[in-house]
Amino acid sequence: MKLLAVRRLLRIQRVVIRYRLDDLLFDLPLPWFLLALRYVLPWRWFPRKPLELSRGARLRLALQDLGPIFIKFGQILSTRRDLLPEDIADELMRLQDRVPPFDSQLSVKLIEEQLGKKISEVFSRFDVEPLASASVAQVHAAQLKTGEEVVVKVIRPGLKPIIAQDLAWLFILARAAEKVSADARLLHPVDVVSDYEKTIYDELDLLREAANASQLKRNFEGSPLLYVPQVYWDWCRPKVLVMERIYGIQVTDLATLADQRTDMKMLAERGVEIFFTQVFRDSFFHADMHPGNIFVSTVNPWSPQYIAIDCGIVGSLTPEDQDYLARNLFAFFKRDYRRVAQLHIDSGWVPAETKLNEFEAAIRTVCEPIFEKPLKDISFGQVLMRLFQTARRFNMEVQPQLVLLQKTLLNIEGLGRQLYPDLDLWNTAQPFLERWMRERVSPKALLGNVQSQFEQLPHLANMARDLLERMSQPHANDPPPPWKKRKDDWFLRLLGSAHLAGGTILAAGGPLHELGHWPAGIMVAVGLYLVVRR
């Protein structure tokens, strides 16, 4: 083991001892040989002064002491309310990703290396004092030679070895937890760390963030709801991002918003509309919309517009996930728990062999108390969290895209009610969802669906051959994997498209037109059924 890794291990051990995290560990239902360690560990042989801190606060402070990589891991973990006790999740939400800035001259050197030019050749002004500094990057204000006011984001130097080292220890801890604890295995700690690994490495590529920002800007071009700063692609590199500098009011600065006479009700409702527009219209949503990344334009306080920055983390849903999510929400608010359970099974979110009656009863037990509150006080985010918590007891697979969506919804919802406490999220979202559902089954949408799937017809023969080969192989009678339901649905919709195409050809005077219109009618009817069935 390398000296650096040993030093890091000793550092982790000191933090564990300082914040009594070993006490939290031994409170868990562990195997006897691990519980016996409480009598073996040397630091437990002597009396220790008790800490007047909750378990969540101790964990939060420990992660802060361990540095930026553990801080960001804690922030991501705080969004997994389907896995964590509420008190711990609430404490982890308070983690602040603030670290001292690195040397400004080093920042200038890194920017010049990435751009291949001197700072003075690109910028007429460059502020060496950073505007902000976080664990992954820091930001400087500047002005381009062409006159535009911009911000320059630069990745911290030497991050990859630190990230690799800390991730290695996180994986070791996660694998150990899965081996020794059945309860830990249900939480899939290795999967959680794997998701974090992907997220943290994605954040190191600023070209990815630039592309996300450009896509989001294009989606809301000309919209009164949301403004996204312009990316200056000529000066963007993997470790440097140059984009328009924005001036606005921090969304949590309620006093300044009030002084501007901002319409708080409209501002809160527009936040909800932005969220549902991103999720259902665009299937591309900003997944890191905490208050530090959201501002409000000062231009029209009576018609307030949001400004979003930091698009490093985004999420997207498949059309199937969009459809099932919308239907789940409608079924939930109708208290149709059987429908909710069936939709979870149909979507492949829980195994196909799940007992519907038991799943329905579990959902009813958890969710029915929610309706004791007035409708305006019901939390969408809490609804999703409760549904996912229940589904995990029935072996629901981790759905990273739904985790991001739940996190974003909780942020938007909490923010909306902070701005306007009487925000009725359901009444605000319901018209949008109903309109989206109607558009999904409109003739135009069906035609587009048919056209897109008609393009896949050349692959139909290959799919059929592959299907026959799989059926002929051993284990063909094993229970189908979770993804099989969706594959089968896609195959049937493709078959439906073929029927629609064939029926259209017959109706237009194909080779069998002398048989009359009834064969074409049957083919079109069967095709429509297969295409729109759920």
UniProtKB/Swiss-Prot annotation:
Membrane topology: Multi-pass membrane protein
UniProt keyword list: ATP-binding, Cell inner membrane, Cell membrane, Kinase, Membrane, Nucleotide-binding, Transferase, Transmembrane, Transmembrane helix, Ubiquinone biosynthesis
Domain Protein kinase, first and last residues per copy: 125-492
GO cellular component terms, semicolon-separated: plasma membrane
Localization: Cell inner membrane
Main subcellular localisation: membrane
GO MF term set: ATP binding; protein kinase activity
Any single biological process term in GO: ubiquinone biosynthetic process
Membrane-spanning residues: 23-43, 490-510, 512-532
Phosphoprotein in keyword set: no
Nucleotide-binding listed as a keyword: yes
Enzyme Commission number: 2.7.-.-
InterPro entries named among the record's database cross-references: ABC1_dom, Kinase-like_dom_sf, UbiB, UbiB_bact, UbiB_kinase
Active-site feature positions: D288 (proton acceptor)
Metabolic or biological pathway, per its Swiss-Prot or TrEMBL entry: Cofactor biosynthesis; ubiquinone biosynthesis [regulation]
Residues involved in ATP binding: L131, A132, S133, A134, S135, V136, A137, Q138, V139, K153
CDD domains: UbiB
Role played: Is probably a protein kinase regulator of UbiI activity which is involved in aerobic coenzyme Q (ubiquinone) biosynthesis.
Record family assignment: Belongs to the ABC1 family. UbiB subfamily.
Name used for this protein in its record: Probable protein kinase UbiB
